[in-house]
């Protein structure tokens, strides 16, 4: 059977490669051959190699329209309602994903977002009405534009944990705290394709409010603090090698002193470059030492999310301070210049979490 009748196979395949990710659900419904083709990992490798992939920044972002109000005594406390917004970096277009199943009151607060292949994984968070810790897992497929409910995270309630993915199949989770605010040293891995959780060996120390990245085949957990050191962020880091299934320390001084006042927002590039946004500084690690490579623009210095594009350029999302509009910038590493991304009133709400997806 031909991909497209009366067209050479190479030309027909090129047509599929050039399609927008938003057309994937429609393409999958055309015929089984198209559905199978766009589901193959080779399709996305060819799409990326030919320069037709699309870079997306996916955010847990508050709605800007009138917020839902929670009445407490004589006071009215505004409670932002969060939803998932998508920024297409190539075009600047923004959109919103369908609501997460069973969450008419918005996304769980402080949930974590991770991309795995062409899927988005939403992990845990706090119920926006009761503020109870959730162990829920939801997976959104950009191929079908549908949600599915994943297996709940085991091990009891956990919030403010670090997570990262290998971008292919697995999501790694570590640290955070339980319902009694006790910092945790346990870690888990979630196989998205198999919808299966497994426990990893414990880390070497408790790490609440830590951050994480995945690169060079390792899951790196950075900073955080123990139960007895509430708010005193550690300079240390440790990494989990998926091949040896073991943790190893990254040294007692992985972070510099000025980077422990508040947890840095980190990102790792495909070439191994490691960047961190810390207060007003853009930092880069070279030869195991952090160097300042630039100043963050004033209206984005309260950073919510940072990602490294395939070109090596950085995308930073944030605001001047909490309550101010969220904006985005692209940092060109070739000339160290910042370019402000186009803004839209509808998508200026506070951002709690984000992830990067190339599809």
Curated annotation (Swiss-Prot):
This is F-box/kelch-repeat protein At1g15670. InterPro entries: Kelch-typ_b-propeller, Kelch_1, KMD1-4. GO terms for biological process: negative regulation of cytokinin-activated signaling pathway; regulation of phenylpropanoid metabolic process. Signal peptide: none annotated. Keywords: Kelch repeat, Repeat. Kelch repeats lie at residues 119-167, 170-217, 219-269, 271-310, 313-358. GO terms for cellular component: cytosol. Residues 2-49 form the F-box domain.
């Amino acid at each position: 059977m031909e991909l497209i009748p009366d067209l050479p196979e190479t030309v027909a395949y090129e047509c599929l490669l050039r399609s927008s990710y938003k057309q994937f659900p429609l393409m999958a419904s055309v015929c089984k051959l198209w559905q199978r083709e766009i589901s193959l990992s080779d399709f996305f490798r060819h799409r990326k190699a030919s320069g037709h992939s699309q870079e997306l920044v996916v955010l847990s972002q508050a709605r800007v329209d009138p917020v839902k109000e929670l009445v407490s005594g004589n006071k009215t406390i505004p409670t932002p309602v969060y939803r998932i917004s998508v920024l297409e970096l190539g075009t600047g277009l923004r959109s919103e994903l369908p609501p997460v199943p069973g969450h008419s009151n918005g996304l769980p607060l402080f949930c974590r977002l991770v991309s795995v292949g062409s899927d988005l994984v939403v992990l845990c968070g706090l119920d926006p009405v009761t503020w109870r810790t959730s162990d829920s897992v939801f997976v959104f497929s950009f191929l079908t534009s549908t949600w599915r409910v994943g297996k709940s995270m085991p091990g009891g309630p956990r919030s403010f944990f670090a997570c990262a993915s290998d971008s292919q199949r697995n999501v790694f989770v570590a640290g955070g705290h339980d319902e009694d605010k006790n910092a945790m040293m346990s870690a888990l891995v979630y196989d998205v394709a198999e919808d299966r959780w497994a426990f990893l060996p414990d880390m070497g120390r408790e790490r609440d409010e830590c951050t994480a990245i995945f690169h060079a085949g390792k899951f790196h957990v950075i900073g955080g603090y123990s139960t007895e050191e509430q708010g005193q962020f550690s300079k240390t880091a440790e990494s989990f090698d998926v091949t040896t299934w073991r943790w190893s320390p990254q040294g007692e001084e992985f972070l510099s002193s000025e980077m422990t006042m508040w947890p840095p927002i980190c990102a790792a590039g495909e070439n191994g470059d490691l960047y961190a946004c810390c207060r007003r500084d853009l930092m880069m690690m070279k030869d195991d030492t952090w160097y300042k490579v630039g100043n963050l623009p004033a209206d984005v210095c309260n950073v919510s999310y940072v990602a490294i594009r395939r070109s090596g350029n950085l995308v930073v999302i944030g605001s001047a301070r909490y309550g101010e509009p969220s904006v985005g910038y692209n940092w060109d590493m070739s000339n160290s210049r910042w370019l402000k991304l186009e803004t839209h009133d509808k998508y200026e709400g506070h951002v709690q979490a984000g992830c990067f997806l190339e599809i």
